[in-house]
């Protein structure tokens, strides 16, 4: 293509110029800028190619581990957990053990240990996991026990086999199960506000079911499985709309179990598509499908995922709500992209159709690649891994800042991709 440009340019110059001297001058005047332009074009293409080639989950994980390790040494108190970095700050603001986000930081540390094998990071993970034990043995005043305990003790048990961790997990599952209302068939969300809201079920709560499924397979009551399956079923039937977008909140009559209405709490409007809620659905229903082998849960994850992917903006990272009125100037939500990537990778491992399997893996890889770009990757800007997450826009809370759960799901997605790449490399070696 570059050669054709030169030939075309030279031919036109030869035709137009009568004077040989003037021709040479004119050629020089035109060729030099052209050569400069083409050179820049080559450099630009090479740079773009280099950026694509250089994205490696293993490389990014290595960089992230170094940053996480450095950050852990600055969080002095084991009962204070990073949550967000406000605008103008470079270090994490922390919350106590009872905040719903308390499990994400120890979860990040466990992922960093899994990626590196660094024993000093393991010690940090153990240190920040220990305080969450109290959640498992206290009355359930928070439905997010799965986020809090499974992401801390769950990873700890998976990576160490510590029997004490297992007992904490089993107790946490029993505690979460106390929020189940058999009249409705779902776990109560926001139990501390039950006088105001009666029985609500939010889409986020799908992510707490993994704790129940795990416990039922590891020495807990089979009732825990039944509760988790019922909750997923009620959520599927009532919170997933005909257009495949998801209500944030479903309100039910706590006595009759009747569905009253779907509404939002953190989205733009009741009928809008709140980005992170949609991704909780992708991932949550994929987990439910994996644990129950129910095709309707798998189909729900697929249609929710397809609706999400079909509505993504050009760079692939969703705005906080797909129907926010100020798009394209609305804040993005990198955390939703991270959750989506994990859900899509889970979904890719469940579908049998090879084309669909590749579609969801490619979509997840693209999301993580964009999150790893200079637009979203924090680098040296602050202690977080990712920029541009949005927590609760209607309350003007945590808007366009780093939030800890974005980093958690980013680390999970990177680890998943690394394992997929290693498996593919291993297969290629066998074939050769």
Language-model-detected regions and their locations in the chain:
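Bacterial N-terminal signal peptides that target proteins for export
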Residues: 20-34
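Short, linear, compositionally biased motifs with a strong N-terminal bias
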Residues: 39-40
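C-terminal motif of bacterial Sec signal peptides marking the signal peptidase cleavage site
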Residues: 43-44
């Amino acid at each position: 293509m570059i050669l054709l440009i030169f030939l075309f340019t030279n031919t036109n110059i030869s035709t137009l110029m009568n004077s040989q001297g003037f021709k040479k001058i004119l050629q020089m005047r035109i060729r030099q800028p052209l050569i400069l332009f083409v050179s820049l074009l080559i450099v630009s293409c090479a740079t773009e190619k280099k950026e694509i080639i250089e994205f490696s989950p293993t490389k990014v994980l290595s960089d992230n581990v170094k940053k996480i390790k450095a950050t852990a040494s600055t969080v002095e108190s084991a009962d204070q957990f990073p949550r967000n970095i406000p605008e103008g700050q470079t270090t994490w603001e922390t919350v106590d053990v009872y905040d719903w986000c308390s499990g994400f930081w120890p979860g990040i540390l466990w992922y960093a240990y899994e990626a590196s094998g660094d024993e000093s990071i393991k010690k940090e993970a153990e240190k920040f996991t220990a305080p969450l034990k109290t959640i498992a043995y206290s009355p359930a005043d928070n439905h997010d026990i799965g986020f809090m305990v499974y992401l801390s003790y769950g990873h700890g048990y998976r990576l160490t086999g510590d029997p004490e961790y297992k007992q904490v997990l089993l107790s946490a599952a029993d505690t979460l199960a106390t929020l189940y209302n058999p009249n409705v068939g779902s776990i109560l969300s926001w139990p501390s506000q039950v006088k105001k809201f009666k029985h609500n079920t939010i889409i986020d709560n799908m992510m707490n079911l993994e704790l129940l499924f795990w416990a039922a397979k590891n020495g807990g009551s089979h009732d825990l499985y039944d509760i988790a399956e019922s909750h997923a079923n009620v959520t599927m039937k009532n919170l997933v709309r005909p257009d495949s977008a998801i209500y944030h909140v479903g309100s039910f009559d706590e006595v009759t179990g009747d569905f009253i209405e779907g509404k939002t709490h953190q989205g733009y409007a009741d009928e809008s598509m709140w980005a992170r809620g949609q991704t909780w659905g992708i991932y949550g229903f994929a987990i439910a499908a994996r644990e129950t082998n129910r095709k309707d849960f798998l189909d729900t994850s697929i249609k929710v995922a397809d609706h999400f992917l079909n509505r993504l903006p050009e760079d692939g990272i969703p705005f906080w709500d797909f129907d926010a009125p100020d798009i394209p100037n609305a804040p993005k939500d990198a955390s939703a992209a991270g959750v989506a990537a994990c859900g899509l990778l889970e979904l890719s491992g469940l579908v049998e159709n090879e084309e669909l399997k590749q579609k969801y893996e490619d979509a997840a890889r693209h999301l993580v690649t964009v999150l790893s770009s200079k637009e979203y990757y924090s680098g040296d800007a602050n202690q977080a891994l990712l920029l541009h997450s949005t927590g609760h826009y209607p309350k003007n809370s945590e808007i366009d800042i780093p939030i800890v759960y974005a980093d958690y799901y980013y680390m999970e997605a990177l680890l998943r991709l690394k394992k997929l790449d290693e498996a593919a490399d291993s297969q290629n070696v066998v074939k050769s």
